[in-house]
UniProtKB/Swiss-Prot annotation:
Protein's name in the database: Adenosine deaminase
HAMAP family: A_deaminase
Binding site for Zn(2+): H19, H21, H208, D300
Cofactor: Zn(2+)
Family to which this protein belongs: Belongs to the metallo-dependent hydrolases superfamily. Adenosine and AMP deaminases family. Adenosine deaminase subfamily.
Species of provenance: Mycobacterium sp. (strain JLS)
SUPFAM superfamilies: Metallo-dependent hydrolases
Catalytic class of the enzyme: hydrolase
GO MF term (any one): 2'-deoxyadenosine deaminase activity
Catalytic residues as annotated in Swiss-Prot or TrEMBL: E211 (proton donor)
GO cellular component, one term: cytosol
Cofactor stoichiometry and binding remark: Binds 1 zinc ion per subunit.
EC numbers on record: 3.5.4.4
Length: 362
């Protein structure tokens, strides 16, 4: 018998998450406590519920630039090794509680040195938090693997330095590199040196592209930078035409994106908040899934979007009528697209994801 697709049941399904920002996933209570501990006085509220409402409301801005503004508060309380360790630990705890079995969590080390820490110390603290979180989850009967992507800010000029950081930590839990931040005026090609360095070291990277900006951002990320994955990439829909009879025609950029199986790290709720799409029902996720792009489901910023992987999946189920086999496919897509070794990916797919979805599908 097929298990009903409720939030409770979806929460029991194994999930793989590729696009989640550490500084966008703090618990509101943790933000308050860290602010008190470290003397951060700029929070807009001193009540947990009011603070949660602030982050959620501020994120529903219709603009990527305005969506990013509340991050000043989360980053502001993440300036010590102890704070970074705690946030990383709780991140793993929260993801494991949602039955995420694999996650790549990203953050920008350059944003966490205001308290005097060096970049290496910042990464060390986060990786230690992830490792301790994994152990705690295992002790609670929930197995999860969390790896790290280090991100460079696209408006800054430290991307080569951050790419070198990724390579230094590649055997200690960092599996890739990313650039993030406001897209308009800061094309991916500003950071070619960093991407060339990653390729020269046989390393993997994803690029935020096609979120607030359009097709040129995606084209640069693929054609000139050589991205292994696209962070968001939702604007690829602008290169797809659907005729009145339902026939779908791909433009050349969309075609090569699909043909090369370049994964899309789609974040439905976040895309609505930033104005990239009007609503979940109007999100191109389903069009992209039906035309066999490699789509994945992601949270982006769990605090700002007040979301979990289970909630993202449920919203897609409600909008597009997906079943367990669809959710399994999206999860396998993510696992196939992860930056860990092939045999580790395969083990999670064959030993964890497929068997558990088979039970749910009846």
């Amino acid at each position: 018998m097929t298990t009903p697709l409720t939030l409770e049941n979806i929460s029991q399904a194994p999930k793989a998450l590729l696009h989640d920002h550490l500084d966008g996933g703090l618990r509101p209570s943790t933000v308050l406590e860290l602010a008190g501990q470290y003397g951060y006085d700029d929070l807009p509220a001193d009540d947990v519920d009011e603070l949660a409402t602030f982050f959620r409301t501020a994120a529903h801005s219709g603009s990527l630039v305005r969506y990013l503004e509340p991050f000043a508060h989360t980053v502001g309380v993440m300036q010590t090794a102890e704070a970074l360790h705690r946030v990383a630990f709780e991140c793993v705890e929260d993801l494991a509680g949602d039955n995420v079995v694999y996650a790549e969590v990203r953050f920008a080390p350059e944003l966490h040195i205001e308290g005097g820490m060096g970049l290496d110390a910042v990464v060390d603290a986060v990786l230690a938090g992830f490792a301790d979180g994994e152990k705690a989850a295992a002790s609670a009967g929930r197995t999860i693997t969390v790896r790290c992507l280090v991100t460079a800010m696209r408006h800054a000029a430290r991307s080569r330095e951050i790419a070198e950081l990724a390579i230094r930590f590649r055997d200690r839990g960092v599996v890739g590199f990313d650039i993030a931040g406001a897209e308009a005026g800061y094309p991916p090609t500003r950071h070619l040196d960093a991407f060339e360095y990653m390729r020269g070291n046989n390393a993997r990277f994803t690029i935020h592209a096609g979120e607030a900006f359009g097709l040129p951002s995606i084209h640069e990320a693929i054609a000139f930078c050589g991205a292994d994955r696209l962070g968001h990439g939702v604007r690829i829909v602008d290169d797809i035409t659907v005729a009145p009879d339902g026939q779908v025609k791909l433009g050349r950029l969309a075609a090569i994106l699909r043909d090369k199986r370049i994964p899309l790290e789609l974040c439905p709720s976040s895309n609505v908040q930033t104005g990239a799409v009007a609503s979940i029902a109007e999100h191109p996720f389903d069009l992209l899934a039906r035309t066999r792009f490699r789509v994945t489901v992601n949270t982006d910023n769990r605090l700002m979007s007040d979301t979990t992987m289970s909630q993202e999946m449920l919203r897609l189920v409600e909008a597009f009528g997906y079943g367990w086999s669809d959710l399994a496919r999206f999860t396998i897509n993510a696992m196939k697209s992860s930056f860990i070794p092939f045999d580790e990916r395969l083990a999670l797919i064959d030993d964890v994801i497929k068997p558990r979805y088979a039970v749910l599908a009846g």
